[in-house]
Amino acid sequence: MEKVKAWLIKYKWWIVAAIGGLAAFLLLKNRGGGSGGGGEYMVGSGPVYQQAGSGAVDNTMALAALQANTQLSAQNAQLQAQMDASRLQLETQLNIETLAADNAHYSTQSQLQLGMAQVDLSKYLGDLQSTTSTALAGMQSDTAKYQSNIQLQAENIRANTSLAEIDAQKYIVGKQADIAKYQAKTERRGQDYGFALGLLNFGGKFF
């Protein structure tokens, strides 16, 4: 059905021309002819008058009118076909140009979006690198501070240990001195007790 419809659309003017020519032929044939009778024939858009003549002349004029109408219809059909072909060509060209423009627009939009994506990626990588560098610098600074604090604490511990050792040494020396003094005092007391005891023993001999 679609093929028949397409064929009718394609050859519609030829069909119209053929029907018009056939109708004109039948009309002129019915009106023409007869002895002494006049006939009126249409050629194109103007009448052709036959004042008087035989049936042969009428038939000749009818045939001429039919040929003229048929030729005119054929020319109109050909012109319409050319116009349809030109319109189809223009529409096809327009569709091609529109498609090319759409493709160009799509390509431009794609390139623009790709460029924007690359810019966003570069910005993201730059921000990430900056953030990473800042964080790394902070970690290095914290590590340095921590190491410095550890070292300071170690030095303080060593210093306190040295002071404790000095204090212990002083304490030991002091205790040793006290012991020596106590021993000396004890020895003196012993000597004093011995001397006193000797005196008592010596005095006892006389009494």
From Swiss-Prot:
Transmembrane segments: 13-28
Protein localization: Virion membrane
GO BP annotation list: symbiont entry into host cell
Keyword annotations from UniProtKB, A to Z: Capsid inner membrane protein, Coiled coil, Membrane, Transmembrane, Transmembrane helix, Viral genome ejection through host cell envelope, Viral penetration into host cytoplasm, Virion, Virus entry into host cell
UniProt membrane topology term: Single-pass membrane protein
Major subcellular site: virion
Coiled-coil region: 64-95
Cellular component, GO, one term: membrane
Protein function: Component of the phage ejection machinery. Pilot protein for the formation of the tube that conducts the genome into the target cell. Probably involved in penetration of the bacterial outer membrane and for making the peptidoglycan layer accessible to the viral transglycosylase. Essential for viral infectivity.
Name by which UniProt lists this protein: Infectivity protein P11
Native species: Enterobacteria phage PRD1
Classification of source organism: Viruses, Varidnaviria, Bamfordvirae, Preplasmiviricota, Tectiliviricetes
